[in-house]
């Protein structure tokens, strides 16, 4: 990690910032500050904000339970996409999880989120299941959720 990069552990004091960043990434489906507060008060949920030159560029929130973790939400600000931050954030999460003896990671992603699917596959995730018609789109259509896992 360069001197310009910094990891900040998420706390309840970051709920507004997380909600703002989430809304820029998930228009129409964003979580609000209350949602993040409810997540962050649970002991099994953790997260960090990835900053570059003191500017928050993305964050990831996950849940840890008995040697496994699940990504609950993850985003990179649209202004900072395609610059390698997504890969850096997941790599930092893997480093952390390895240190705390988590050996399996799970996530779910919309089957039409091709960029995210490509990233996750490149980071070692494989599809293990699907949830049929799980995500509802604004036009009324549905898409499957792809459940993926990776060994840490």
Where would I find each of the regions flagged by the language model?
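Acetyl-CoA-dependent GNAT
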Residues: 2, 9-83, 90-92, 96, ...
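Structural preference for beta-strand elements that scaffold enzyme active sites
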Residues: 68, 104-106, 147
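Short amphipathic helical patch at the helix-1/turn junction of helix-turn-helix
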Residues: 76, 110-111
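Short glycine/proline-centered loop/turn elements that form peptide/ligand docking sites
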Residues: 86, 90, 113-116, 133-139
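Short hydrophobic clusters on alpha-helical segments that form packing/core surfaces
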Residues: 93-97, 105, 116
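Conserved catalytic-core motifs of GNAT/GCN5-like acyltransferases
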Residues: 106-108, 121, 126-141
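Terminal substrate-recognition subdomain of acyl/acetyltransferases
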Residues: 140-152
């Amino acid at each position: 990690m360069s001197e310009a990069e910094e990891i900040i552990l998420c706390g309840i004091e970051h709920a507004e910032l997380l909600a703002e960043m989430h809304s820029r990434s998930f228009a129409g489906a964003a979580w609000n500050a209350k949602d993040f507060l409810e997540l962050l008060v649970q002991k099994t949920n953790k997260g960090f904000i990835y900053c570059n030159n003191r500017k928050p560029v993305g964050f990831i929130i996950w849940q840890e339970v008995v040697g496994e973790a699940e990504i609950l939400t993850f985003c990179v600000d649209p202004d900072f996409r395609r610059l390698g931050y997504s890969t850096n954030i997941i790599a930092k999460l893997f480093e952390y999880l390895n240190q705390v003896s988590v050996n399996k990671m799970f996530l779910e992603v919309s089957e039409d989120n091709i960029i995210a699917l490509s990233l996750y596959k490149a980071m070692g995730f494989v599809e293990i299941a699907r949830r049929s018609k799980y995500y509802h789109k604004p036009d009324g259509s549905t898409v499957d959720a792809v459940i993926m896992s990776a060994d840490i």
